[in-house]
């Protein structure tokens, strides 16, 4: 089954950055407990622009789809109050295998 991911761009004002990072760090702990991964990258030319990559094994287990604990929902809402997410932030992407097809 292919891995599923989102690539969410978010603009975070400098005054919110420390809180944004702490909130995402806390959310990562919940994700890791479920076998999910979250990576964060900062744009090299625009220090207020970040991209959150969130990966899970299935669509239904992804943070954009899965039912979650109330604590996680609060953290997600907090993140959305600290930054401005791009409109396509929660589009799901599925992994494409580049392995050579096997002959039968």
Language model features by range: what are they?
Residues 12-14, 56-58, 94:
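Non-catalytic surface loops within mature trypsin-like serine protease
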Residues 88-104:
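Short, low-order "capping/linker" segments at domain edges
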Residues 3-11, 51:
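Active-site-flanking beta-strand signature of metal-NTP-handling nucleotidyl enzymes
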């Amino acid at each position: 089954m292919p891995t599923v991911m989102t690539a969410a761009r978010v603009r975070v004002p400098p005054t919110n950055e420390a809180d944004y990072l702490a909130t995402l760090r806390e959310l990562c702990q919940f994700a890791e407990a479920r076998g999910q991964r979250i990576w964060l990258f900062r744009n090299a030319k625009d220090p207020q622009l970040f991209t959150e990559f969130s990966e899970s094994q299935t669509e239904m287990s992804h943070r954009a789809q899965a039912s979650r604990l109330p604590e996680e929902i609060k953290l997600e809402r907090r993140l959305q109050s600290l930054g401005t997410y791009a409109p396509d932030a929660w589009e799901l992407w599925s992994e494409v295998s580049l392995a050579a097809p096997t002959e039968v």
